[in-house]
């Protein structure tokens, strides 16, 4: 079905350089560009930007 095409699984990698990642899904129709979310990085022990990695 179209489930895999509309809401793919993506990795969000920390920009702090710790290598920590979150795994989530996104809607390609609403967010066609690469996602950037501000989330908690437990390795750096602070909130940092997480960028989508393909």
Swiss-Prot record:
Which SUPFAM superfamilies does the record cross-reference, listed alphabetically? Zn-binding ribosomal proteins
- Which UniProt key words apply to this protein? Ribonucleoprotein, Ribosomal protein
What's a Gene Ontology MF term here? structural constituent of ribosome
Query: Cross-referenced InterPro entries, in alphabetical order?
Result: Ribosomal_bL33, Ribosomal_bL33_CS, Ribosomal_bL33_sf, Ribosomal_zn-bd
Report the record's Gene Ontology biological process terms.
Answer: translation
Coiled-coil stretches, from where to where? Answer: none
Family in the record: Belongs to the bacterial ribosomal protein bL33 family.
Q: Which HAMAP family match?
A: Ribosomal_bL33
UniProt protein name: Large ribosomal subunit protein bL33A
Originating species: Streptomyces griseus subsp. griseus (strain JCM 4626 / CBS 651.72 / NBRC 13350 / KCC S-0626 / ISP 5235)
Species lineage, top-down? Bacteria, Bacillati, Actinomycetota, Actinomycetes, Kitasatosporales
* The gene coding this protein: rpmG1
């Amino acid at each position: 079905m179209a489930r895999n095409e509309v809401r793919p699984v993506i990795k969000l990698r920390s920009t702090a350089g710790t290598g920590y990642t979150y795994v989530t899904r996104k809607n390609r129709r609403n967010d066609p560009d690469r996602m950037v979310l501000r989330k908690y990085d437990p390795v750096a022990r602070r909130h940092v930007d997480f960028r989508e990695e393909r």
